[in-house]
């Protein structure tokens, strides 16, 4: 913990020194407005100043991303107040975006958008498997916290993250960028833009990232260790390192003119490591091949001074091919008469080549919507939207265990896999989902100082029927430098296909009678522009979530159930301070308390306190320095977990860059986890030492513009 304190002291001392050295400049009038850089569409569907928006909005620009030395999306999102990125204990250390204490291992409570279009997988309702997103194609990221289903429908539950890509209309120089870093990591980017005088043209970007992962992320014990102790075998790969290698490709092609735009985005993570293993048994042979392709056609037209229309048509394809060694070669596993591990009436079975599963799925999704905006009524903006979604989901599976393959009476078993595709023994049968929706919203500027936003959205799903979610926002601006907000919203989270229809899976089966999760959020916000260079934002919130879906033991079988209620409250404080034209400071502090209202237990694995402080300093001769510190507080354990509270940590990143403008060249050195903090993210008791995060890494970056 002394490193955490030391990191913050370094930042504060550094800031003080720079403030004194630049005092003459700081006292001058700064030709900079924080508000001018921060406009957003995420809160209301049309462009407006963030501080006037009916929501709690954070905006991270491409310039912010470039200065902080981040290489993937998770590092950027960690800077948002109230948002903490964990690693999933259930799903191969995939990112979990915990917002205000709301989270689960598959990340379905946060809606992720790409240019305003969702790209979740219907299997889990979270991001595509092993999702890791490079950053150079991103123009800005907009985040709204709180219930937002009145605008965005399902899964806009704890918040919405909209990733907005660069496009023809943005001034983007052609670049080639190469980064080399620790753990045999390499990132390569090339981008190019062509446009005519009318603004028509194209933008193309391709990014490729590879890494072998940090081999020092060691876990001393896993589930196979426990099985070895009980069965007398020695099959566990622990102590061993987490399997965190990746090979990510992201390609974007944007073609547009003044009214049409066509965005095509391809993303792939090929041969990705399986983290701690899908059964929490280390797996050095398993991998995930995950890919996503999205084609989005948009038409936007201002009809006249009062009316505007926007229509969108999107096709999204997802594909996931997996090879999992649930338990390693030579493991002796109790197999029930249904062929699954650990089910009742079992016999020990020796798996010579390991317990192997190779599930695959692909999903096709079509989304269409039309939005109409009308400002013909005095002091009002009316917005209405109608649309539909159609999803088809197809599965296949090969394995050497489970129903239709084993009955627990034959031993040993080798690595030959049985194809159960199309049979009743597959993990999930093919599915389809249909959803139609209608939304309406009115923003009424009924007084020069007051704006009232009222809206709602009706959704109808083929599985569970209709649901309606309202919103209400009152914005008060008594002075040009102060804004107050009262916000209320409701949201729902649709059950995923796995929660509804999973079968032949010892870790949990679905329940077709599941209801959507529901939430109500209340919030008070004060946004104060203390000076042209200093902005303070404070928010206090309360929420109540119902019908949360959990995997519960029903008889002798784990099954997904609407089994929990949760309440939470908290405080978020954010400051943005431009001390001079050379020096900028950002900081935030968040506190949250959330608990299960049925049991009174504090929600585990979520820090109550988090903080962030960053410094950007543009020095003489085109040198620049960025230093940031994340402070993550301690996290409580589950009531049945006898381990000590998980300690907090501080994570510091330093970037030093030098521009050679006459040569269109920039070089940089980036150091992540600057103080080599022993940072850990929570695990289940099966892996008692928690999951270590990456140690210190050093990167060299070179960018050429032309």
Regions found by a protein language model. Give the residues of each.
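Extracytoplasmic beta-strand/coil segments of soluble accessory domains associated
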Residues: 31, 42, 74, 78-117, ...
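Short acidic/polar hinge/loop motifs at secondary-structure boundaries
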Residues: 117-145
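Periplasmic-side early beta-strands and strand-to-turn transitions of outer-membrane beta-barrels
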Residues: 150, 162, 170-171, 179, ...
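Face-selective signature of the C-terminal outer-membrane beta-barrel domain
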Residues: 254-269, 291-464, 475, 534-540, ...
